[in-house]
Amino acid sequence: MDSLTGQILGKLEELGLTENTMVVFSTDHGDMLGSHRLFNKGFNMYEEDHHIPLIIACPGKAEGISMDSFVNTVDLMPTFLDAAGCETPAGVQGKSLMPMLEGKVPQGWRQESFSEFNGYESTLLTSRMVRTRKWKYVYNPFGQDELYDMESDPGELHNLAELLGFVHVLRRMRKKMLGCLREYEDSIAEVTSWQSNSYGLFLSDREE
């Protein structure tokens, strides 16, 4: 992969396009590589699958900047439009990353990351995930909910969703998920009963 990336960059330089071309290196998913006894990509919400690289080189922007804000691949389209001097159409998901290429975090930037997997035949293995810096909550409509402390348990080895002492965290993370579902117009509520499998708590507006 390093060699092929080098070939692409070399060709851009050969054609004289380096100074007016934005280069983005990313991927659509990670690989478990044996973590959690899993290989390849999977129908799970572990970091190995969902924490992917995103490297952007843009002419005229600062070099060597590393940002730890939550970004998603849906942010790429608005970024490309912004770089080209175009307006992002109303209703488009995602936000431009151009300010971050100068080391600036836009005001009101998201404080969580949201991921979705639609499984097979709409329901089998379907799941949703919302993650803050400290907590990750995974909603599995037809399985066990998951809650991980990403600071003390970055390997996601200890599911806290069934512990009574973390019910308040579940409620808080569930509200964050509802906000994400509304923002991305997720239709999962039309498929499932919206009942969490942890202590019979419901995922509904009535919890707000």
How should these model regions be labeled?
Residues 10-72:
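Histidine-centered active-site microenvironments of extracellular/periplasmic hydrolases
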Residues 127-144:
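Low-complexity, glycine/alanine/valine/leucine- and proline-rich hydrophobic stretches
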